[in-house]
Amino acid sequence: MLLAIDVGNTNTVVGVFEGEHLADSWRVRTDPQATADELVLLYRGLLGEYQVTGVSICSTVPAALRALRRMVVRAFHDIPVVIVEPGTRTGVPILIDNPKEAGADRIMNTLAAHHLYGGPAIVVDFGTSTNLDIVSARGEFIGGIFAPGIEIALDALASRAAQLRKVELVAPRSVIGKSTVEALQSGMIYGVAGQVDGLVRRIRAELDTDAVAIATGGLASVVIKESETLDRHEPHLTLIGLRLVFEKNI
């Protein structure tokens, strides 16, 4: 079985593949201070009886990746390991000014999106930041957009405005909030949906094509219900990319 690990700034998504089938997945908090020993205990607890025969990793957190490398050496002996970094074969041409700036997770999303849907495509990843990544008809990564993530925006409001606080991220009963909680929820959910819809429309106009828009990331399931432009929901898009890149390198 393939262990796929996507280390993000806030959360780490872990999946186990049996062939092309995602047999299980977990979302845990990313801790850049965690030691290799702590990670060994964590992953042994998650995996239980699963017999891992390969590991595929991407990370946007260098400190976390260093400990993860040591964990893999300790916990998994004599099995192939692929870490997505410069020099790794991905099959994705990176057509931006400085290809080294493209995060490994964005390249995995590009790879998976083109594999599943072809192109052109727009991947909207609702994570710590909201990323829109653009995939050409040939599967090239041609650029993207960064915007503050929903939780970052909510944290900023709660910390900077004395009368506001963090709320559950669900759609309120109406766009016009009847309470502080509903007003915040409306701004977060409908506001982000409107922002994404506006950006997707602008991207489609610039590409002059109706590119498929794919939502992924932890909060995608909330926003896609309120969006007018998001076409598909693939919650494990990055993990699928990790499976594909493993196959290309082993």
Swiss-Prot record:
One of its GO terms (cellular component) is cytoplasm. ATP binds at residues 6-13, 128. It comes from the Bacteria. Substrate binds at residues 103-106, 180. One of its GO terms (molecular function) is metal ion binding. K(+) binds at residue 125. One of its GO terms (biological process) is coenzyme A biosynthetic process. It is found in: Cytoplasm. It catalyses: (R)-pantothenate + ATP = (R)-4'-phosphopantothenate + ADP + H(+). A monovalent cation. Ammonium or potassium. Its EC number is 2.7.1.33. Belongs to the type III pantothenate kinase family. Homodimer. Catalyzes the phosphorylation of pantothenate (Pan), the first step in CoA biosynthesis. This is Type III pantothenate kinase. It comes from Frankia casuarinae (strain DSM 45818 / CECT 9043 / HFP020203 / CcI3). The lineage of its organism: Bacteria, Bacillati, Actinomycetota, Actinomycetes, Frankiales. The gene is coaX.
